[in-house]
Amino acid sequence: MQVDVQNTTVISADGSSIKLGKYSGEVILVVNVASYCGNTAQYEDLQKLHDLYSSKGLRILAFPCNDFGKQEPDSLSEIKDFCTTKYGVEFEIYEKVHAKGNTTEPYTTLNKVEPEGDVEWNFEKFLIGKDSKVIARFKPGVKPFDENLIAAIEVALDS
């Protein structure tokens, strides 16, 4: 089933509701993130992706999540401070979400992507095309510079 996020509403860091359709015409990489996780160092490469591809139309949207091992207990302001201080993060960090069980958007919608089901762990990635349709789902162990992820990003940007 092809999943469309055009009308999916998320909560920004300032508390306002935003439809992901706002990013139509751009490629989006949605990532659930955590500050105290074995995968936290992926922030560094996510920022490098942002540096390399944001001018070409890639938007990285990070959604802090405390569902996995309680690895994101901090407030949003503490999370943002950690990300900017330690990793120089400039991409967008949204309000905390639930990615498994009683999910919140965008995961209520994204968890319908094959293989359907809850996000497995922190730093699972969803690549969304310019048409707001999900192109691919990448498990948490897939690093930001994995050749398959980079290839998918480049194809999406060129489409």
Predicted segments — roles?
Residues M1-G21, A41:
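N-terminal "domain-start" segment that seeds a small globular fold
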Residues E26-V27, S35-Y36, T40-P64, T84-Y87:
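Conserved helix-turn-beta segment immediately C-terminal to the redox Cys motif
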Residues C37-T40, F68-Q71, P144:
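Acidic-and-aromatic substrate-binding clefts and catalytic sites of carbohydrate-active enzymes
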Residues G57-D74, E90-G101:
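Thiol-based oxidoreductase modules, predominantly thioredoxin-like and allied folds used
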Residues S77-N122:
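Short, internal strand/loop/helix patches
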Residues T108-S159:
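Thiol-/selenol-based redox modules, centered on thioredoxin-like
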